[in-house]
């Protein structure tokens, strides 16, 4: 976000007051993003760039003054730009907010953060008692919201990240068996299977409702001959040398710290020699500079908003150590925005 700063020297008292309000503004912009998505504002402006507030209100059936205030506020935070008397999406936000078929569509993400923000009502009590409320106890509606918000993550991986990981890409092209740990609603399972027709995919998750969502998605996509989803934890696999690739998307940081060594060991056992383990996750910043800089500081924020779930976001160094302790060797690495991507190989 933007904030006024003193031209030279340390920030003034007024600067810091403005900074506080700028931080609070993020709460309200999160709600604006979701309200605009629900109303269809972003998609309407992708269809008709240059539409003025009154015309947009007519198309959406909304109040013209309310619609104009929404657009002006979105403009003030860089989401919209002027086009003559009307509005258009700012650079790249047409893909990010206005095109559900885009690989980079993230318009559902604000909704998830609004839902998980409800946990904050209990934070003071958790702080005082040292208690947790695990992710899996948040109910079916929350699981649906998460599945919807994360369904583009595998597309981002396949379209933008995988080309930077030639070893893993070659293995997937060859085909074989793939295990997705923490499959959630099944989007990684089906999208990887659709992209690589010689690959069969198995998804596992400890949350039963998410597994049912994944099973339904597999059936809807006509992939039941190559894809499965099971309610199972990774340490219940009981399979040795069974998979060419194991994937995990935003899952490793959600495994309880006491269970992580066993989970990594189970993955190592399940991989065939020469197989790959993909960790697409957050990595907690290891320096003050990265702790204070976007996008890396978002991992610290993830540790904060998932704090009472019992999650611990590992640093990159800690992830490497976990791989080594399980007998895996880091083979490839890259990053995308807030995400750290590691590929470890089984010798």
Task: Please tell me what each predicted stretch does.
Residues 182-186:
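Class I SAM-dependent methyltransferase "Motif I" SAM/SAH-binding loop
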Residues 280-326, 331-333:
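C-terminal alpha-helical "lid/dimerization" subdomain adjacent to the S-adenosyl-L-methionine
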Residues 235-246:
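A short acidic, Gly/Pro-enriched loop at the edge of an enzyme's catalytic core
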Residues 326-347:
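Core SAM-dependent methyltransferase catalytic element
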Residues 189, 194-235:
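Class I SAM-dependent methyltransferase SAM/SAH-binding core
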Residues 23-27, 35-36, 44, 68, ...:
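Conserved Class I S-adenosyl-L-methionine-dependent methyltransferase catalytic core
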Residues 261-273:
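A short glycine-rich, Lys/Arg-flanked "PGG" loop and its adjoining helix->strand segment in the class I
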Residues 244-258:
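A short SAM/SAH-binding and catalytic strip from SAM-dependent methyltransferases
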């Amino acid at each position: 976000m933007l904030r006024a700063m003193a031209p030279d020297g340390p920030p003034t008292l007024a600067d810091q007051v403005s900074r506080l309000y700028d931080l609070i503004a993020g709460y309200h912009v999160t709600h604006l993003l979701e309200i605009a998505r629900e109303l269809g504002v972003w998609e309407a402006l992708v269809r008709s760039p240059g539409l003025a507030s009154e015309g947009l209100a007519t198309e959406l059936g909304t109040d013209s003054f309310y619609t104009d205030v929404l657009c002006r506020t979105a403009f003030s935070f860089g989401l919209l730009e002027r086009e003559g008397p009307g509005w258009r999406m700012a650079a790249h936000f047409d893909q990010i907010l206005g095109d559900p078929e885009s690989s980079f569509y993230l318009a559902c993400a604000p909704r998830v953060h609004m839902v998980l923000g409800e946990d904050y009502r209990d934070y003071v009590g958790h702080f005082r008692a040292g208690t947790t409320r695990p992710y899996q106890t948040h109910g079916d509606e929350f699981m649906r919201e998460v599945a919807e918000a994360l369904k583009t993550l595998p597309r981002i991986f396949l379209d933008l990240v995988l080309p930077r990981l030639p070893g893993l890409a070659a293995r997937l092209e060859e085909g074989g068996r793939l295990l997705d740990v923490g499959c959630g609603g099944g989007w990684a399972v089906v999208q990887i299977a659709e992209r690589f027709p010689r690959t069969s995919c198995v998804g596992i998750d400890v949350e039963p409702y998410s597994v049912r969502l994944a099973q339904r998605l597999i059936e809807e996509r006509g992939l039941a001959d190559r894809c499965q989803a099971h309610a199972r934890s990774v340490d219940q696999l009981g399979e040795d040398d069974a998979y060419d690739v194991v994937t995990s998307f935003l899952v490793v940081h959600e495994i309880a710290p006491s269970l992580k060594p066993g989970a990594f060991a189970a993955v190592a056992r399940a991989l065939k020699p020469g197989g790959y383990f993909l960790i697409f996750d957050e990595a907690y910043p290891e320096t003050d500079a990265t702790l204070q800089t976007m996008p890396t500081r978002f991992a610290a924020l993830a540790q904060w908003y998932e704090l009472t779930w019992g999650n611990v976001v590992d640093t990159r160094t800690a992830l490497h150590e976990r791989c080594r302790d399980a007998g895996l060797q880091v083979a490839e690495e890259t990053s995308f925005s807030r995400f750290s991507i590691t590929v470890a190989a089984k010798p």
